[in-house]
Amino acid sequence: MFKSIQAVAKRPNSRWWLSAAAGLAFTVTGTINAAKAEDTIKIGILHSLSGTMAISETTLKDVMLMLIDEQNKKGGLLGKKLEAVVVDPASNWPLFAEKARELISKDKVAVVFGCWTSVSRKSVLPVFKELNSILFYPVQYEGEESERNVFYTGAAPNQQAIPAVDYLMSKDGGSAKRWVLEGTDYVYPRTTNKILEAYLKQKGVKDEDIMINYTPFGFSDWQTEVSKIKAFGSAGKKTAVVSTINGDANVPFYKELGNQGIKATDIPVVAFSVGEEELAGLDTKPLVGHLAAWNYFESIKTPANAAFIKQWHAFTKNDKRTTNDPMEAHYIGFNMWVKAVEKVKSTDADKVIEALPGIEAPNLTGGTSKMLPNHHITKPVFIGEVRGDGQFDVVWKTKGVVPGDAWSDYLPGSKDLDADWVTLKCGNYNRVTKKCGGQGS
């Protein structure tokens, strides 16, 4: 071809021929590139790699790369290799929406795995609905939501917050009578604490025995706040702290607990957003006995978990890298998505959304998780105590798996709502009015 172009170029009036030849070359190249692009299935990874949430989210990007690599070693999916497209929304909530749009519209990803905070999830929801794409969300959250385009593989409040309070109220958990609800100032802690406050009052806890406090993202000056907790806990009744603090603010919070000598035997703290990753950089000796509620702990001994940890260490080339609950949620969600795609032999969003409810995938703790019609999954619940090495000893667990409930039974505007995308095709069906479109609290 190139010899022909050179020959034509020496002739008079050859500009048209050159243009045509160049156009043909561009068309051929474009066709090759398009065919090349179609040879892969693109998967979007939407996690903060910088900013206040990087401490928690970077690991989720890494585990997705591992899962994609593993699937490619098995031969890919539908005869194609999987290709990760990684972006950094930088703990900037509006930027999450921009990056989600970029992944779906520009990069043409088939699915997105991402977000940690509820404010980031809320930011991207309109984009996924408008562009009809799929988001797998791997972190515990406040509930009060069920969207057609989202699959929630983290815990709903009935799979984490409520069981944690029940444990702390029990004799084994210390029979707590006073409660500090301490959280970061955004939608997840505020809604979760609204549910917990209603639940505690149903259990007979009085207003004066509930203290609620919020601090900004990235908060670091915990001396005054921890002093308030200490004072509240010195009133003669057993006091417990329920922590919905998110991101790197957890590090100075736990350091200050140690500085002020608050031991788990005095005022136990149960955390919903602190796991092995967040404790990795801390001196955990002063924190021994404090608690976390999750659906997975690295210390749980099963063949599946041992294999997962070994694979993780090999992939990261670092035996000190920990595993945690949201990583397991991505493991479950990714395998569910793969099964759904194989079932419908397509990555078409509508087909995959229809196929996902009913899909089962193994978890890492010895059981199976199932995607429910409300786009939440079944999960076991564990309460773990912090050990001196930054791991957790399981001190309590449910007998089996707990189905995720999208709408709280303890809030007036929510208790009559159901989410069912299989039969009702609705995420907020009101059982009283028999209509879709109910509003939660």
Predicted regions and their residues:
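C-terminal segment of classical bacterial N-terminal signal peptides
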Residues: W16-S19, L24-A35
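Extracytoplasmic "Venus flytrap"
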Residues: G44-V63, V87-P94, W116-V119, T184-R190, ...
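Extracellular/periplasmic Venus flytrap/periplasmic-binding protein
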Residues: E98, E142, N149-Q260, S299-A307, ...
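Extracellular/periplasmic periplasmic-binding protein-like sensory domains
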Residues: E256-Y331, V341-T347, K397-T433, G437
